[in-house]
Amino acid sequence: MRRFHWASGALALMSLAAGLQALGCFPLDYTERDHGVTPGSGSAGGEAPREPRCVPGLQEGPDASCGIFVSVEAGPRGDGSKERPFNTLAAAIDAAAGREPDQRRIYACVGTFMEKVVLSADGIEVYGSLACDQEWRLAEEDRRTTLGAGPDEIPLTIVGGGGSTRLEGLEVVARPAARPGGSSIAVVAEKVKLELVRCTLQAGDAKHGESSDNYEMDAQPGRVGGDGAPACSALSGAGGISDPLECDEDVTVGGIGGQGAPATAGQGNPGSPEGATNTGGIGQRAAAFCSVGGPGGRGQDGAPGEGGVGLGQITRSGYKGVDGANGARGRPGEGGGGGGASRGRFEAARCPAMGPTSGAGGGAGGTGGCGGLGGRGGQAGGSSIALISLASELRFQEVTLVAGKGGNGGAGQHGQIGGAGAEGGKGGDAPDGLQDGCAGGMGGHGGAGGDGGGGTGGHSLAIAFKGMPVPPSEGQGFTAELGEPGAGGPGFQGRDGATGNRAIALGFDE
């Protein structure tokens, strides 16, 4: 990994500092580490230089009147002074925000602050990694002020009104993501001039996107068609009726059976949705028998969902990847056609004396099964991002940006299997010498739901930015360490999600 150092500048500055010290301009410890004097540093936007008495060094700490003091080991009743520091960064930031713009300095002791911090006041300067037991001087290199938060939380969010914020000697660490598709993001900066000096921003590994389990049950099956009325009955040979089956916005219903009259026999009605095969059965004609209703056709399968593509979105809340598209719902099976009816007879010998002389009704067609639900698309994998910059101006000096691994996209889910079609109703019974009515047709099987597409893989990024200006390149005050991007989630029939990106800086402008 390439690393950038201000080596030659530092040697020249130390020589200059020694000469200036001899003239009594400022103490040597002020120049022993960069404090905004080397190239590429200084207050963003050309603010006035910082007062030497307020800048901690190796030999001397800041003056007590310079700002707010905070230590994680302090008691709960601190007032922000050197003697009684606050014990949370949030309290120190609130206190600093109420001071004059040139007095908004915060001095933080070595230690780990576990809190989610939002910094929204312009002009804040935070000096970390100070040895509180040594008059708030700069601590040794291996002793740091660290800011962390819980899983799936962004430890530090900086929101400005176009003003500047300066952080020095801080280590901001985002924990590995915990929820499915979660991201790990160390810092978000929005509309601010942000200067980072001797800081490390470290994001943990992101989480893989969720893959839904396949459906355990088929879609709702069809309903059996009603039976036709028997011959010689008071029901006048009525055909069977099928109750409609509602499948979301679709409806499937079997055709009504034909009606049996004394001298004629009706034809069954076609099922719905109408197709090529679910016609109604023919009623009895002379010596020819009636016919059963035609079977309903299979419902159309739902279209598969496409795999997720695109970079996703970055906002103050973090990162949101692109999920795979859901598959479309299958269409219901066609209802079976109604069965044809049979004729009655006027002869008293065929039906009871003085009773009805109707023929037998045809059975209703069975309804089709409902179409299967579409498979859910795979969830996008989370991203590991050291710094999100939203329309912010960034300046770095001896900064390390660390990103972990992006999460893999979730797999697309198989669509639900369509419901089975139902049997048609039976034709009505008839006494000897008359024909029974004919049965209704079988309902069609519901179409399968379309399979879901795979989710996008997450990114591994040092800087994710949106809006101007474009952030500096690696070597301009910072080095970067990156993990591997997440793989796209598998879809079906090649509809995989896109693989994530591994980049020093990646723009998300549309």
Question: For each predicted feature, which ranges?
Answer:
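Right-handed parallel beta-helix
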Residues: 128, 164-174, 193-205, 246, ...
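Bacterial signal peptide processing site
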Residues: 26-29
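C-terminal motif of bacterial Sec signal peptides marking the signal peptidase cleavage site
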Residues: 21-24
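Right-handed parallel beta-helix/beta-spiral solenoid domain characteristic of secreted/periplasmic
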Residues: 124-180, 185, 205, 216-218
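The right-handed parallel beta-helix/beta-solenoid scaffold, focusing on the short coil/turn
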Residues: 66, 104, 115, 122-124, ...
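Right-handed parallel beta-helix/beta-solenoid
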Residues: 31-91
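N-terminal extracellular ligand-recognition/capping segment immediately after the signal peptide
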Residues: 100-138, 152, 403
